[in-house]
Curated annotation (Swiss-Prot):
It catalyses: an N-acyl-D-glucosamine = an N-acyl-D-mannosamine. It comes from Homo sapiens (Human). Residues 195-216 are annotated as: Leucine-zipper. Gene3D superfamilies: 1.50.10.10. It comes from the Eukaryota. Changing C400S: Activity is similiar to wild-type. Its EC number is 5.1.3.8. Keywords: Isomerase. This is N-acylglucosamine 2-epimerase. It is an enzyme of class 5 (isomerase).
Length: 427
């Protein structure tokens, strides 16, 4: 038998597995989007309900600005990139959500600071002294511009982006956070991560903005890479502004899912920059390292928090399994495999995806449970709340469906020619 035949059979089997996952992911994306379209739209005031029980019933009508922005972004991205989602109902809901944000998100217009929580009809309830409501507001406006062509949305996005950059790099006083003498000058990884995500968002197919924010993107990547500490053996969630480890629990804190999400943000940056050396570093430190330290050897799934010195983490939910770290891990491993071809990363994608689909998805009512015990049992039956909306699950499924489709569209390698039998006269 030709030596090339088993290899060809292996490749065909791999393609069958990729195709099966593409179909499985696509069907799940349809179910998840249908859940949010059926249960979350506020037809009276615009925007979205995110506090939804298992069956989709609204248990609280407060509106969280960052989740409003995420859902607008998600709907517009689906509308733009998938033919089956290109229908008026989805875009109209996104526009209604965008208009709700334009009217009510900012606490004291023309100031840019956004509320964290609004009443159903848009009155501010709470403000956070962070940049995250504003970041998702920016993402929403940019995607609305891309989906509708209405320039006013893009103007809003760029103005808010420039305000965020000012807060982060020049003067944070506008966030309202007091400078306390005993507080360490800490940099959470979330800040450069979020900015890098915005750089990618605004620069997509836009040479002018890509050029404007190119230096910022490099700055963000450097700041994220500073979180690799202890001679490359740990990625820490918080470091000093100078890139050094901080003392105490804050300094030892690790979040494997967040590191994996940072990993695929950095991978996109590497791909755009054409930097294979950085890509290899990112795969090693931001994909493989957090997975091997963060995967529960007894019950499967990723721990939510860890302590770099193996003390018991102080967060009560540290051992729980949450939906979003697993969504981000699926994206990270599939993106890493798509770019590097390393079969180890594909096997890890399958491992995480099998666990995630088995434990989190709700085959009866749709969408995914968000909060499981360490053993993988449902701890909270809600499908949405102050921190879970229409974002991590559909973003994961949409990106994975696209990446799986791209892998399947690649031509299969040509089989190696069979060796020519040696001539007996030459023996």
């Amino acid at each position: 038998m030709s030596k090339g035949l088993p290899a060809r059979q292996d490749m065909e089997k791999e393609r069958e597995t990729l195709q099966a996952w593409k179909e499985r992911v696509g069907q799940e994306l349809d179910r998840v989007v249908a859940f949010w379209m059926e249960h979350s739209h506020d037809q009276e005031h615009g925007g979205f309900f995110t506090c939804l029980g298992r069956e989709g019933r609204v248990y609280d009508d407060l509106k969280y600005v960052w989740l409003q922005g995420r859902q607008v972004w998600m709907y517009c991205r689906l509308y733009r990139t998938f033919e089956r989602f290109r229908h008026a109902q989805l875009l109209d809901a996104a526009k209604a959500g965008g208009e709700f944000l334009l009217r009510y998100a900012r606490v004291a217009p023309p100031g840019k600071k956004c509320a964290f929580v609004l009443t159903r009809d848009g009155r501010p309830v709470k403000v956070q002294r962070t940049i995250f409501s504003e970041c998702f507001y920016t993402m929403a406006m940019n995607e609305l511009w891309r989906a509708t062509g209405e320039v006013r949305y893009q103007t809003e996005a760029v103005e808010m982006m420039d305000q965020i950059v000012h807060w982060v790099q020049e003067d944070a006083s506008g966030l309202g956070r007091p400078q306390l003498q005993g507080a360490p000058a800490a940099e959470p990884m979330a800040v450069p991560m979020m900015l890098l995500n915005l750089v990618e968002q605004l620069g997509e197919a836009d040479e002018e903005l890509a050029g404007k924010y190119a230096e910022l993107g490099d700055w963000c990547a450097r700041r994220i890479l500073q979180h690799v500490q202890r001679d490359g053996q740990a990625v820490l969630e918080n470091v000093s502004e100078g890139g050094k480890e901080l003392p105490g629990c804050l300094g030892r804190q690790q979040n494997p899912g967040h590191t994996l999400e940072a990993g695929w943000f950095l991978l996109r940056h590497c791909i755009r920059k054409g930097d294979p050396e950085l890509r290899a570093h990112v795969i090693d430190k931001f994909l493989l390292l957090p997975f091997h330290s963060g995967w529960d050897p007894d019950h499967g799934g990723l721990f939510y928090f860890q302590d770099a010195d193996n003390f018991c983490p102080t967060q009560l939910e540290w051992a729980m399994k949450l939906w979003w770290p697993h969504s981000e891990a699926m994206i990270a491993f599939l993106m890493g495999y798509s770019d590097s071809g390393d079969p180890v990363l594909l096997r890890l994608f399958y491992q995480v995806a099998e666990y995630t689909f088995r434990q989190f998805r709700d085959p009866e009512y749709g969408e995914w449970f968000g909060y499981l015990s360490r053993e993988g049992k449902v701890a909270l039956s809600i499908k949405g709340g102050p921190f879970k909306g229409c974002f991590h699950v559909p973003r994961c499924l949409a990106m994975c469906e696209e990446m799986l489709g791209a892998l399947l569209s690649r031509p299969a390698p040509a089989p190696s020619p069979a060796p020519t039998p040696a001539c007996r006269g030459a023996e």
